[in-house]
Swiss-Prot record:
Active site residues of this protein: 91 (proton acceptor)
Function as written in the Swiss-Prot or TrEMBL entry: Catalyzes the dehydration of trans-3-hydroxy-L-proline (t3LHyp) to Delta(1)-pyrroline-2-carboxylate (Pyr2C). Is likely involved in a degradation pathway that converts t3LHyp to L-proline. Can also catalyze the epimerization of trans-4-hydroxy-L-proline (t4LHyp) to cis-4-hydroxy-D-proline (c4DHyp) in vitro. Displays no proline racemase activity.
UniProt entry keywords in alphabetical sequence: Lyase
Organism placement in taxonomy: Bacteria, Bacillati, Bacillota, Bacilli, Bacillales
Stated family: Belongs to the proline racemase family.
Protein's UniProt name: Trans-3-hydroxy-L-proline dehydratase
Catalytic activity as recorded in UniProt: trans-3-hydroxy-L-proline = 1-pyrroline-2-carboxylate + H2O
Amino acids binding substrate: 92-93, 250, 255-256
Gene3D superfamilies linked: Diaminopimelate Epimerase, Chain A, domain 1
The gene coding this protein: prdF
EC class of the enzyme, as a word: lyase
SUPFAM superfamilies: Diaminopimelate epimerase-like (SSF54506)
EC number: 4.2.1.77
Source organism: Bacillus thuringiensis subsp. konkukian (strain 97-27)
InterPro entries noted in UniProt: Pro_racemase_fam (IPR008794)
Length: 334
């Protein structure tokens, strides 16, 4: 056996959505900001993403993270997230998992009953709070970047279907649509059709308009499509599944998607400041969300959302790359 690379990871999940935190084997990542570091990874470290996200070490739905030194003077650390298509700008379930793993493995030092962390992400500064009992994390909440409705009631015509979507930012840009527009339910049996529609809607919007953040050139494009449905659980407000990247299915309620959904509900006067919004996902897991404050992003009215969930560690791994392996860079099916 020959080994050219060794990577260590800690894996976790949030409502079924995986996060693989890469703890060893990562070279120096250059850049003064997280957006610059993300761009560096896209140009120089995409092989690492392919090796650890793709089969045979990962799968089509795998999500990953690298914890970096802080980019700003007052932050505790930075994060860079990756998936089956590339490098994302922010990931809410990833924040929940990173804080949980960091505390439960002793990576992060905590004192008192609650601990907050200031985190640099490519989308901006995120503040996370952990509620824990000894070494066990009970839940993690995070105050996300200002989230806003970019365009509402955008008309879409695809395959003789006419419907409208709202486009909102919650750390990334999402199109929000009701699943009933297609006669579908947010359930396993309709998932293939939902994936198909997610890809079509994303490509349609990006062919018709440029979606970009008014203050940050590096934040642009439709990241995912949120399909909204009536909840199954009596304690839930809405049910959803998010299709993002290259047809990837978010098993969790989607942290940045929940933030975008909070912005759309607030815009429609369907959610008030301080009111709890319970977002249910396709695995029946739930996030709690609320509007903490109202602010502005350029000319857009925005909200600062808070999202709460919990994560569980699933394993500690050591992956190797054999230079003789024709599939050493990985592959994707599905």
């Amino acid at each position: 056996m020959k080994v050219s690379k060794v990577y260590t990871t800690i894996d976790a999940h949030v409502a079924g959505e995986p996060l693989r935190i890469i703890t060893g084997g990562v070279p120096e990542i250059k850049g003064d900001t997280q957006l610059e570091r993300r761009a560096y990874c896209m140009e120089h470290l995409d092989h690492l993403r392919e090796v650890l996200m793709y089969e045979p070490r990962g799968h089509h739905g795998m999500y990953g993270c690298i914890i970096t030194p802080p980019a700003s003077a007052h932050a505790d650390f930075g994060v860079l997230f990756m998936h089956n298509e590339g490098w994302s700008t922010m990931c809410g379930h990833g924040i929940i998992a990173v804080i949980t793993v960091g505390i439960e493995t002793g990576m992060f030092e905590v004192t008192g009953e609650k601990q907050n962390f200031i985190i640099d992400s490519p989308a901006g500064e995120v503040i996370a709070y952990a509620k824990y009992n000894g070494s066990e994390v009970e839940s993690v909440s995070f105050e996300n970047v200002p989230s806003f409705v970019y365009k509402k009631d955008v008309p879409i015509i695809i395959d003789d279907y006419e419907f409208q979507v709202d486009i909102a930012f919650g750390g990334a840009f999402y199109a929000v649509v009701d699943s009933k527009e297609f006669g579908l339910k947010v359930d396993f049996k309709d998932l293939s059709a939902i994936q198909m529609w997610g890809g079509k809607i994303k490509h349609y919007i990006e062919s018709k308009m440029e979606v970009k953040h008014p203050l940050e050139e590096g934040l642009k494009g439709i990241y995912g499509v949120i399909f909204s449905d009536e909840p199954k659980g009596e304690d839930a407000t809405l049910r959803n599944v998010t299709i993002f990247a290259d047809g990837q299915v978010d098993r969790s309620p989607c942290g940045t998607g929940t933030s975008a959904r909070i912005a759309t509900l607030f815009e429609k006067d369907a959610l008030q400041k301080g009111e709890i919004f319970v977002h249910e996902c396709i695995t029946d897991g739930k996030f709690e969300g609320e509007v903490l404050s109202v602010t502005a992003v350029d000319t857009y009215e925005a909200v600062v959302p808070k999202v709460t969930g919990h994560a569980f560690i699933t394993g500690f791994h050591q992956f190797v790359v054999d230079p003789r392996d024709d599939l050493k860079r990985g592959f994707l099916l599905g």
